[in-house]
Amino acid sequence: MTNIRKTHPLAKIINNSFIDWPAPSNISAWWNFGSLLGICLILQILTGLFLAMHYTSDTATAFSSVTHICRDVNYGWIIRYMHANGASMFFICLFLHVGRGLYYGSYMYPETWNIGIILLFAVMATAFMGYVLPWGQMSFWGATVITNLLSAIPYIGTSLVEWIWGGFSVDKATLTRFFAFHFILPFIVLALAAVHLLFLHETGSNNPSGIPSDSDKIPFHPYYTIKDILGALFLILVLMMLVLFSPDLLGDPDNYIPANPLNTPPHIKPEWYFLFAYAILRSIPNKLGGVLALVFSILVLAIVPLLHTSKQRGMMFRPLSQCLFWLLVADLLTLTWIGGQPVEHPFITIGQLASILYFAILLILMPAISIIENNLLKW
């Protein structure tokens, strides 16, 4: 009798995606992050659902409701901190996943790559709106500053900002709609992730060598399921160490002060995972220019496939490109550090140089170095 997982219409889809799916035999631990992101997303949806049962999206009670969750709800504190630090783990996995794609040339699957970029924007939007919900000082002022950036759009900017706010400032209407969007977006992300996976399974996985691996495939289960479980255990270990030992390590102390429109915090800054983009935004003195640079800092990923000039797919056998890649990583870490610093000398100059270098590496240096490497192959 044929196995039910190969005949049942629904089980067949799962079987072909996660059990009998032919995977390259040489994919490394850098290929673990897709499954880890799936785990993060499910974890965020589940913890978020339980938080939403006790949270109130009203300016008068939002801050108190979060306090109530931590103090009065059974295990509310662990759910709240798993959700907050789960977002950090989500972004760590996201950055490593995108970095893997850049390093090994996974962007040569344009459909999968472009859906990935849309996913990145959707997750960033979700995280931003989630940060507003506790209604602390940094929530309020972060929302004010970031939504205000849209006023840089010529002609319709001011009307657009007031339309998003639902009034003339960030207030009750803003909080309510942000809660609604924060609730629905993860389910949209889930649907997009399914499409992302669908496109990936049309082409099959890339591998470290960048050479087609059709002649050497192994079944996903048990080889990669066990590998993914190991990665998941590491993820949960790091997350629970954060949650149980230093839950506020990655947060901002200002967010334990209730939102006060009359008192501006000395340094308004977003969560750590947005600091690199925030540093690029602040590096440009012009408001509209800064907003465009902010959007383009992520959107630049969409033109990376068009600028691929190398004869080889990945960077495994391209030492010059590897040097540039790790320079890009160092540059992003520098931008993250600068984003959390006050706007004063020497941080302004460092931020501007790091921002120029970020775009230069992706748009100019990478394609140029690839051409040089192509010529070196002839020698």
Swiss-Prot record:
Primary subcellular site in the record, as a coarse category: mitochondrion
Record keywords: Electron transport, Heme, Iron, Membrane, Metal-binding, Mitochondrion, Mitochondrion inner membrane, Respiratory chain, Transmembrane, Transmembrane helix, Transport, Ubiquinone
GO MF assignments: metal ion binding; ubiquinol-cytochrome-c reductase activity
Keyword Transport found: yes
GO cellular component: mitochondrial inner membrane; respiratory chain complex III
Transmembrane segments: 33-53, 77-98, 113-133, 178-198, 226-246, 288-308, 320-340, 347-367
Keyword Heme: yes
Cofactor annotation comment: Binds 2 heme b groups non-covalently.
Pfam families: Cytochrom_B_C (PF00032), Cytochrome_B (PF00033)
Names of required cofactors: heme b
Topological category with respect to the lipid bilayer: Multi-pass membrane protein
GO biological process, one term: mitochondrial electron transport, ubiquinol to cytochrome c
Binding, heme b b562: 83, 182
Record's function text: Component of the ubiquinol-cytochrome c reductase complex (complex III or cytochrome b-c1 complex) that is part of the mitochondrial respiratory chain. The b-c1 complex mediates electron transfer from ubiquinol to cytochrome c. Contributes to the generation of a proton gradient across the mitochondrial membrane that is then used for ATP synthesis.
Similarity section: Belongs to the cytochrome b family.
Name of the featured protein: Cytochrome b
Organism: Martes zibellina
Gene: MT-CYB
